[in-house]
Amino acid sequence: MVASCKDQKKAVAICLQRSPCVMIERHNPQECLDNPELNKDLPELCIAQMKAFLDCKRGIVDMTKRFTGNAPLSTGKYDQQYENLCKGKFDPREEMEKLKLLNSQQKD
């Protein structure tokens, strides 16, 4: 994975882990993305972050960005949060509240 898309990838993973599809319905994140029935219920924040990640990946192969660069290198902003979610060190209710808060801020 190119370092410039690492933060976007982790942001998508964190958002999917917090989504009702994973937290409440107990599907895995891949099922939530692949299944159209589950995909339509994803929070707008997750969809926006997925779009940003795909744009970043597209920028890797875009020859016009080869000289100027795709994006800033990874900052490690989501590393600790990602590790906690992967290891199960989180409170599901708290994560759902965070997702609701982030989703409502994006709509404003």
UniProtKB/Swiss-Prot annotation:
Its cellular-component GO annotations read: mitochondrial inner membrane; mitochondrial intermembrane space; mitochondrion
Q: Its GO biological process terms?
A: mitochondrial cytochrome c oxidase assembly
Q: Reply yes or no: does the keyword Transit peptide apply.
A: no
Intracellular or extracellular location(s):
Mitochondrion intermembrane space
Q: What PROSITE patterns does its record include?
A: CHCH
InterPro entries for the chain = Cyt_c_oxidase_assmbl_Pet191
Residue ranges of every copy of the CHCH domain listed in the record = 18-64
Q: Which Pfam families match?
A: Pet191_N (PF10203)
- Superkingdom of origin organism: Eukaryota
Motif placement: Cx9C motif? 46-56
Residue window of motif Cx10C motif: 21-32
Q: State the family it belongs to.
A: Belongs to the PET191 family.
What's this protein's function? Involved in the assembly of cytochrome c oxidase.
The protein here is known as Mitochondrial protein PET191
What is the species listed in this Swiss-Prot or TrEMBL entry? Saccharomyces cerevisiae (strain ATCC 204508 / S288c) (Baker's yeast)
Q: Coding gene?
A: PET191
